[in-house]
Amino acid sequence: MARVTVEDCVLKVPNRFELVLIAGQRARDISAGAKLTVERDNDKNPVVALREIADDTVPLDALQNALIQNLQKHVEVDEPEEDEMEGFIADRDLAFENVANEDEMIEDGMSINDTGADFDVDSGDE
C-alpha cells in the first residue's frame, strides 16, 4: 500500500527527497496532535501523511514553510546602527587600553588589591 501511495505522491511532489521531508513534517505534525484529513485505517503516521499528500487534502506550501522554519538554525536579527557600532568599538578600545595599563603596572611591581574594607584612622585616644 505504501508503494502505491508514494507513486501517487510523486505526481504531487516530483522530487522524492523533498517528498520525504514534507511527509516527515506532516507525520510529526500528526504526532503532535494535528487533525487528520483522511481516515487512519490503522495506518501509522508516515503512511497517513503520504495518503494526505496523495489525496491533496493538506496544503503543501504550509508544510514546506513549517519544514523550513523547523530546520532553520540561524534566525536573522536586525544589525545595530552605525552610531551604536562606533560607540561599541570605542568602548572596546578603551577596555583594551586599560588591560595594557594593568599589565604595565604588574611588570613594574605595582598592583591594586581592593579588599572592600575601609581603613579607619585611629586617633590613639583609646
Swiss-Prot record:
One of its GO terms (biological process) is DNA-templated transcription. It catalyses: RNA(n) + a ribonucleoside 5'-triphosphate = RNA(n+1) + diphosphate. Keywords: DNA-directed RNA polymerase, Nucleotidyltransferase, Transcription, Transferase. GO terms for cellular component: DNA-directed RNA polymerase complex. Its EC number is 2.7.7.6. The keyword Transferase applies. One of its GO terms (molecular function) is DNA-directed RNA polymerase activity. The RNAP catalytic core consists of 2 alpha, 1 beta, 1 beta' and 1 omega subunit. When a sigma factor is associated with the core the holoenzyme is formed, which can initiate transcription. Belongs to the RNA polymerase subunit omega family. Promotes RNA polymerase assembly. Latches the N- and C-terminal regions of the beta' subunit thereby facilitating its interaction with the beta and alpha subunits. This is DNA-directed RNA polymerase subunit omega.
